[in-house]
């Protein structure tokens, strides 16, 4: 009975969670009774810890409602349920066994990455420096890293396609290469190809010019994993979209892994055919958001450590509080600080950083103000600027106001009382409540999460 109720529990979770949350955390679970205990199996430690932390109370509550004092105790484990292991292993064998490497004749469209090479990394254009171990994880990219790890462990079987989207310099490309390195580590013969979407277009043009389109098709449809960066550049390139459509279908039919990245959610990409946008969402779509303060600090500390520099904590926080848009900007700023310190021989202090980054910091202070945030949010939600300062409490006004307060805390250096004062003289506790509410809604609502990411991108661009 408990096992059948588990299926009902799954159905309830599907109703309560977003499609992405359900696909990511609940769908991979299996369950089986062992005596009076319902054992829930997760595919790996990351999923197990996440489900136990986030959803255990919901699961316990469901069984208590249905069975009262007869509700089974719950236990979590890693793996698959024992009675199902033969089936699971057989499925896994089909999905995870990598196809024997096929010799592919060098196509006459003659692109560098198409040449058969002894070195798998060179052949694949996978950068060996991008690993999961040196990817700094935070709330902004946690789901993306978790999904990428599972794809690396089970290419073609975990999430296919995996679609990562977010602004420039947030780590999407790092994750692509990390997955590629993971696949090649597990199977050195795997044919993993990474490229920018423009390269795919260029290859197709060359193939058409050289009357070699069949070789082009054979090459791209023979790879074990295809990773394409910035898929939005396919916009309005009809012939390229047509060819990629058929390549996409062929790879998926063969359980070959596809990972795509974009600066926008699939359905928001202009100039791309609906049938492609639909397919982009067949697997798992994950947003990579701008890093929060703690992650920005961790990125700076990691980068400094790699450069052999002792970066004081207060300096890392000073930089992280002022440069918020993306990882690339942070690393560039730190490189400038390090170069200046090496050149002048001066210690790295807050005053030194102010001097070394004065133009960059001045630009940031000029661009992002509370007034600018209020105007941007009001325009985004189509409310009046006066509503930001009013006492109106209707959700259509209160939610944008809370969003603007949360963004003001994230993107400016103003204190909570100063932010409250800028919103019609509100108390700092009102601002704190708004920040916590938006943080909660970003976890629960895909729409709010999207709004927040879109506004961050707009204000940071």
Swiss-Prot record:
Residues engaged in binding ATP: 169, 171-173
Keyword DNA-binding: yes
Family annotation (SMART domains): AAA, Bac_DnaA_C
Molecular function as annotated in GO: ATP binding; ATP hydrolysis activity; DNA replication origin binding; lipid binding
Protein's cellular compartments: Cytoplasm
Residue ranges, annotated region (Disordered): 99-125
Region annotation Domain III, AAA+ region: where it falls in the sequence: 125-341
Keyword terms: ATP-binding, Cytoplasm, DNA replication, DNA-binding, Lipid-binding, Nucleotide-binding
Region (Domain II): 87-124
Assigned GO CC terms: cytoplasm; plasma membrane
Region (Domain I, interacts with DnaA modulators): 1-87
First and last residue of the signal peptide: none
Region (Domain IV, binds dsDNA): 342-461
Annotated Pfam families: Bac_DnaA, Bac_DnaA_C, DnaA_N, Hda_lid
Main location group: cytoplasm
PROSITE patterns: DNAA (PS01008)
Its job: Plays an essential role in the initiation and regulation of chromosomal replication. ATP-DnaA binds to the origin of replication (oriC) to initiate formation of the DNA replication initiation complex once per cell cycle. Binds the DnaA box (a 9 base pair repeat at the origin) and separates the double-stranded (ds)DNA. Forms a right-handed helical filament on oriC DNA; dsDNA binds to the exterior of the filament while single-stranded (ss)DNA is stabiized in the filament's interior.
Family the entry assigns: Belongs to the DnaA family.
Subunit structure: Oligomerizes as a right-handed, spiral filament on DNA at oriC.
Domain notes: Domain I is involved in oligomerization and binding regulators, domain II is flexibile and of varying length in different bacteria, domain III forms the AAA+ region, while domain IV binds dsDNA.
Protein name: Chromosomal replication initiator protein DnaA
Organism lineage string: Bacteria, Pseudomonadati, Pseudomonadota, Gammaproteobacteria, Alteromonadales
């Amino acid at each position: 009975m408990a096992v059948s109720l588990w299926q009902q529990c799954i159905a309830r979770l599907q109703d309560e969670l977003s499609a992405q949350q359900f696909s990511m955390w609940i769908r991979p679970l299996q369950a089986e009774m062992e005596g009076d205990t319902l054992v829930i199996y997760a595919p790996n430690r990351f999923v197990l810890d996440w489900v136990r932390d986030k959803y255990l109370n919901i699961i316990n509550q469901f069984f208590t409602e249905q069975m009262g004092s007869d509700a089974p105790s719950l236990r979590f484990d890693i793996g698959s349920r024992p009675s199902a292991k033969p089936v699971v292993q057989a499925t896994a064998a089909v999905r995870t066994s990598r196809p024997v490497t096929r010799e592919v004749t060098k196509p006459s469209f003659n692109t560098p990455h198409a040449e058969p090479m002894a070195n798998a990394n060179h052949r694949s254009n996978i950068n060996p420096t991008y690993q999961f171990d040196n990817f700094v994880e935070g709330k902004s990219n946690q789901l993306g890293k978790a999904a990428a790890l599972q794809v690396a462990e089970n290419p073609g079987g975990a999430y296919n396609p995996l679609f990562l989207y977010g602004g420039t310099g947030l780590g999407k490309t790092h994750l692509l290469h990390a997955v590629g390195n993971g696949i090649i580590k597990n199977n050195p013969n795997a044919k993993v190809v990474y490229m920018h979407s423009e390269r795919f277009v260029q290859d197709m043009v060359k193939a058409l010019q050289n009357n070699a389109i069949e070789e082009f098709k054979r090459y791209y449809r023979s790879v074990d994993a295809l990773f394409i960066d910035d898929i939005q550049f396919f916009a309005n390139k009809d012939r390229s979209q047509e060819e990629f459509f058929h390549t996409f279908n062929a790879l998926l039919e063969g359980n070959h892994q596809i990972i795509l990245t974009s600066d926008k959610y699939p359905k928001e990409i202009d100039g791309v055919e609906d049938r492609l946008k639909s397919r982009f969402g067949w697997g798992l779509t994950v947003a990579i958001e701008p890093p929060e303060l703690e992650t920005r600090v961790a990125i700076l500390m990691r980068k400094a450590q790699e450069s052999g520099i002792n970066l004081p904590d207060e300096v890392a926080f000073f930089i992280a509080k002022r440069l918020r848009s993306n990882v690339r900007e942070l690393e560039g700023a730190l490189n400038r600080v390090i170069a200046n310190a090496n050149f002048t021989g001066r210690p790295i202090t807050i005053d030194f950083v102010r001097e070394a980054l004065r133009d960059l910091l001045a630009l940031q202070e000029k661009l992002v103000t509370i007034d600018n945030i209020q105007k941007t949010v009001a325009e985004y939600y189509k409310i009046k600027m006066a509503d930001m300062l009013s006492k109106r409490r209707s959700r259509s006004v209160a939610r944008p106001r809370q969003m603007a307060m949360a963004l003001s805390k994230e993107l400016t250096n103003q204190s909570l009382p100063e932010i409250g004062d800028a919103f019609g003289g509100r108390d700092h506790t009102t601002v704190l409540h708004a920040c916590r509410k938006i943080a909660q809604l970003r976890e629960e609502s895909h729409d709010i999460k999207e709004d927040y990411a879109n506004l961050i991108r707009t204000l940071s661009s």
